């Protein structure tokens, strides 16, 4: 009887571990450790800090070419395209980031800002609703909520 219970306990423990791993992975919003090791990713971040959007686009294109599943790089590629006013390219990059990680807070926020810049408030509100479910008290949620609340069609939005 004890042998049966011990076997059952071990089996349940292994099953719990197997099921827990995907949940942890789905809850991981970024690839920070991996990105630190990518020179072009760092170059892209420096280009964004310097507002050199063309260089940022070039850098992040290289990152996603080498690592197409890097949601962070797709997100920052979208951000850089958006800063250049290339909204179709920006939305395509955000869509890729969100296909990889549907809970990517940065991509949800930045795409929402892009929708506001292109006078698509309903789409921005949809991104905001997703953010509220993921993390109601996060800075990304607060930032997009403020922008949506202050939105006036045709107004210039100061954030990139």
What are these regions (language model features)?
Residues 2-6, 10, 28-37, 125-160:
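Terminal, low-structured helical/coil segments at or just beyond the last alpha-helical repeat
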Residues 35-66:
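Alpha-helical segment of the N-proximal tetratricopeptide repeat
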Residues 37, 71-72, 105-106, 138-139:
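Helix-start (N-cap) detector for alpha-helical repeat units in TPR-like alpha-solenoids
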Residues 62-63, 96-97, 130-131:
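Canonical positions in the second alpha-helix
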Residues 66, 100, 133-134:
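Structural marker of alpha-solenoid helical repeat scaffolds
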Residues 76, 110, 144-147:
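Canonical tetratricopeptide repeat
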């Amino acid at each position: 009887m004890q042998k049966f219970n011990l076997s059952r306990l071990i089996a349940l423990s292994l099953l719990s571990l197997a099921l827990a791993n995907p949940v942890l992975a789905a809850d991981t919003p970024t690839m920070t450790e991996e990105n630190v090791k990518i020179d072009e990713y760092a170059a892209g971040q420096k280009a964004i800090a310097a507002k050199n959007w063309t260089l940022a686009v070039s850098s992040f294109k290289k990152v996603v070419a080498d690592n197409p599943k890097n949601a962070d790089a797709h997100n920052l590629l979208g951000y850089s395209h958006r800063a250049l006013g290339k909204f179709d390219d920006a939305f395509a990059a955000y869509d890729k980031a969100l296909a990889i990680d549907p809970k990517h807070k940065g991509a949800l926020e930045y795409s929402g800002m892009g929708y506001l810049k292109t006078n698509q408030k309903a789409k921005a509100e949809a991104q905001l609703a997703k953010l509220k479910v993921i993390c109601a008290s996060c800075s990304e949620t607060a930032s997009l909520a403020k922008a949506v609340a202050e939105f006036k069609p045709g107004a210039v939005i100061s954030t990139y």
